[in-house]
Amino acid sequence: MPLIYMNIMLAFTISLLGMLVYRSHLMSSLLCLEGMMLSLFIMATLMTLNTHSLLANIVPITMLVFAACEAAVGLALLVSISNTYGLDYVHNLNLLQC
């Protein structure tokens, strides 16, 4: 296995561990989630470049679109929680129910 793939998998694993360890604050959870999506995007792009498949070119772009949507929804939720409660704790998420 080439060294670049091992580095990307290590970045994904570190982001996953950060997501599990720092899950009390929403901002740190969003940053770890973005790190995971970035490493998955780079891995999908490298796999697409190595396979030389024209049909697989849409996969990294689709992942990038979903990552942007996830970031927008996460930041909107962060602003809503911060304006309402003044804190960004994840345990406040269940208080936003109608």
From Swiss-Prot:
Any one GO molecular function term: NADH dehydrogenase (ubiquinone) activity
Transmembrane segments: 1-21, 29-49, 58-78
GO CC term, one of those recorded: mitochondrial inner membrane
Localization of this protein: Mitochondrion inner membrane
The protein's enzyme class: translocase
Primary localization: mitochondrion
Domain of life of the native organism: Eukaryota
Keywords (A to Z) from UniProt: Electron transport, Membrane, Mitochondrion, Mitochondrion inner membrane, NAD, Respiratory chain, Translocase, Transmembrane, Transmembrane helix, Transport, Ubiquinone
EC numbers for this chain: 7.1.1.2
Gene Ontology biological process terms, A to Z: ATP synthesis coupled electron transport
Pfam families with a match to the protein in the record: Oxidored_q2
Membrane topology: Multi-pass membrane protein
Catalysis: reaction(s): a ubiquinone + NADH + 5 H(+)(in) = a ubiquinol + NAD(+) + 4 H(+)(out)
PANTHER family named among the record's database cross-references: NADH-UBIQUINONE OXIDOREDUCTASE CHAIN 4L, NADH-UBIQUINONE OXIDOREDUCTASE SUBUNIT ND4L
Family label: Belongs to the complex I subunit 4L family.
Role summary: Core subunit of the mitochondrial membrane respiratory chain NADH dehydrogenase (Complex I) which catalyzes electron transfer from NADH through the respiratory chain, using ubiquinone as an electron acceptor. Part of the enzyme membrane arm which is embedded in the lipid bilayer and involved in proton translocation.
Description of how the protein assembles with itself and partners: Core subunit of respiratory chain NADH dehydrogenase (Complex I) which is composed of 45 different subunits.
Name of this chain's protein: NADH-ubiquinone oxidoreductase chain 4L
Originating organism: Pan troglodytes (Chimpanzee)
Lineage of source species: Eukaryota, Metazoa, Chordata, Craniata, Vertebrata
